[in-house]
Design a protein with these regions (language model features):
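Flexible glycine/proline-rich, aromatic-decorated loop/lid segments
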Residues: 258-269, 278-305, 315-335
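Single conserved hydrophobic/aromatic residue that forms the stacking wall/gate
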Residues: 2-7, 11, 384-394
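Active-site proximal loops enriched in glycine and acidic residues that flank catalytic Cys/His/Asp
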Residues: 55, 180, 226-228, 268-270, ...
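Catalytic alpha/beta active-site cores
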Residues: 1, 5-229, 234-235, 253-256, ...
Length: 394
C-alpha cells in the first residue's frame, strides 16, 4: 500500500483478533426497565461481552413517561427512563465494573450519564474502573435523525462539556461515538457515511480545542459507529479506509503524533434498512454477510440485527440467534486465527484506495463550504427530511 509509515502503523491491526476477539455487543431495550433488565441478564448469560442500551423516543427527547408528549411512544423503540431509580432497576444484578456499557443517547446524554454515575457511586464503584461509551453525537441528530432539543450551538457546548467531564473523571470511558450508522440508514452512500462522520469528528475536536480541552487525550476517548450494508466488498474496504482517513486527520490536521490517538476504534451494526418484512428467514443470510464484513474490516465490537427487526423489536429467541451468528464466526470459521486475511486482495486494496480518495475529497468539500455546523444551520445536509429506503419500502 502507498501509505506513509505513520498512517500505515495505525492502518494495520498487528494482532487483529488473535489475542482478543471483538466485543459482541447486542443492542437492546424495550417496554420497561424490568423487562429490559431481564433481557440484559439473558444476553450476558448467553455470552455477550458488552451491553448496549436502547432508549425510547421520549427519553431521547427529554420527556418523562407521564408527559402527554410521550403518549404512544413509551417503551416502543427502547427502554423508558425518567428517574435515577429507573437506571438502578435497569442494571439490577449487573456488575458495572465487569461489563462494558454503550448508551445510545445524544440530546439527553448528560442526564443519562449523570444517572449512571450516581448509581455507580451508590454501589461503591470507582469511576476510573467503569468502561463504556456514550454516543453523545448531536451533530448527526441534525443530519440524519432529528431527535435534538436545543439549537446547534448550545447543543455542541453540552457535548463538549461531556468531553471535559469524562476526560477528568472517566478515563476508561469513550465520551463520544461519532456515528455514521444513522447517516447510512437515512439514505446516504458509503462515501457520504464516512465523509459526514469524519467531518462531524473534526467539528467536535475543533470545539473541544476552542474550549481548552486536551484534544490529544480526547482522541483516545473517541470511538466511531458504522453501518455494515449490503455490498460486502465495499463495506470491508470502507472499514479499512476509515482507519487510514482518521489517522491522517489526527496527524495532519491536528498535528497529533501519538499513535494511540490516531487509532480509529469503531463499533459496527448490521444494516436495519436492508431487512425485509417478507420472508424474514432471508434476513439471517443478510446479517451473517454483514457481520462477516465487519469482522474482516477489523471492528472492535459488533451488533447483529435479529431477523424479525423489519417487523418489530427482536424477540428473545431471535436476539439470541443473532448473537449466535457472531459466535459461529468467532469460534467455528477459523477467521480470527489470521491477521487481515483478505488484505492482499487487489480488489480490496483498489476499493480501499478509491474510497479513501473520494471520502477525503468529500470532507474537503464540506469544510470548504463552512463546515458541518454551518451546513446544518443553512439546511444543506439534512438527510432525515427525506424518507429512508426502509420507510419507502414499508
Amino acid at each position: 500500500r502507498s501509505t506513509s509509515s505513520a498512517a500505515s502503523d495505525v492502518y494495520k491491526r498487528q494482532d487483529m483478533y488473535r489475542n482478543r476477539l471483538w466485543t459482541m455487543r447486542q443492542y437492546a431495550g424495550f417496554s420497561s426497565v424490568s423487562e429490559s433488565n431481564q433481557r440484559y441478564l439473558s444476553l450476558l448469560e448467553s455470552g455477550v461481552s458488552g451491553l448496549s442500551v436502547a432508549f425510547d423516543l421520549p427519553t431521547q427527547m427529554g420527556y418523562d413517561s407521564d408527559d402527554d408528549m410521550s403518549s404512544g411512544e413509551i417503551g416502543k423503540s427502547g427502554v423508558p427512563i425518567s428517574t435515577p431509580e429507573d437506571i438502578e432497576s435497569l442494571f439490577d444484578k449487573i456488575d458495572l465494573e465487569k461489563v462494558s456499557l454503550s448508551m445510545t443517547i445524544n440530546s439527553t446524554a448528560s442526564i443519562l450519564l449523570a444517572f449512571y454515575i450516581s448509581l455507580a457511586k451508590k454501589r461503591g464503584y470507582s469511576l476510573n474502573k467503569l468502561r463504556g461509551t456514550l454516543q453523545n453525537d448531536i451533530l448527526k441528530e441534525y443530519i440524519a435523525r432529528g431527535t435534538y432539543i436545543f439549537p446547534i450551538t448550545p447543543s455542541l457546548r453540552l457535548t463538549t462539556d461531556i468531553f471535559e467531564y469524562c476526560q477528568e473523571n472517566l478515563p476508561n470511558w469513550n465520551s463520544i461515538s461519532v456515528s455514521g450508522y444513522h447517516i447510512r440508514e437515512a439514505g446516504s452512500t458509503a462515501i457520504q457515511e464516512l465523509a459526514f462522520t469524519f467531518a462531524n469528528a473534526i467539528t467536535y475536536l475543533e470545539s473541544a480545542k476552542a474550549a481548552g480541552i486536551d484534544i490529544e487525550k480526547l482522541t483516545t476517548q473517541i470511538s466511531f459507529f458504522f453501518n455494515s450494508h449490503r455490498n460486502f466488498f465495499e463495506e470491508v474496504a470502507k472499514f479499512r479506509a476509515a482507519r487510514e482517513i482518521w489517522a491522517h486527520i489526527v496527524r495532519d490536521r491536528f498535528k497529533i503524533t501519538n499513535i494511540k490517538s490516531q487509532l480509529c476504534r469503531f463499533h459496527v451494526q448490521t444494516a436495519g434498512s436492508t431487512l425485509t418484512a417478507q420472508q424474514i428467514e432471508n434476513n439471517t443470510a443478510r446479517t451473517t454477510l454483514q457481520s462477516l464484513a465487519a469482522v474482516l474490516g477489523g471492528a472492535q465490537s459488533i451488533h447483529t440485527n435479529g431477523k424479525d427487526e423489519a417487523l418489530s423489536l427482536p424477540s428473545e429467541e431471535n436476539a439470541l440467534s443473532a448473537l449466535r451468528i457472531q459466535q459461529v464466526i468467532a469460534h467455528e470459521s477459523g477467521i480470527p486465527e489470521f491477521i487481515d486475511p483478505i488484505g492482499d486482495s487487489s480488489l480490496i486494496e483498489d476499493m480501499t484506495n478509491d474510497i479513501t480518495k473520494k471520502v477525503t475529497n468529500k470532507i474537503d468539500e464540506i469544510i470548504s463550504k463552512g463546515g458541518v455546523e454551518k451546513l446544518i444551520q443553512n439546511g444543506t445536509c439534512l438527510l432525515y427530511t427525506s424518507p429512508s429506503p426502509r420507510d419507502c419500502r414499508l
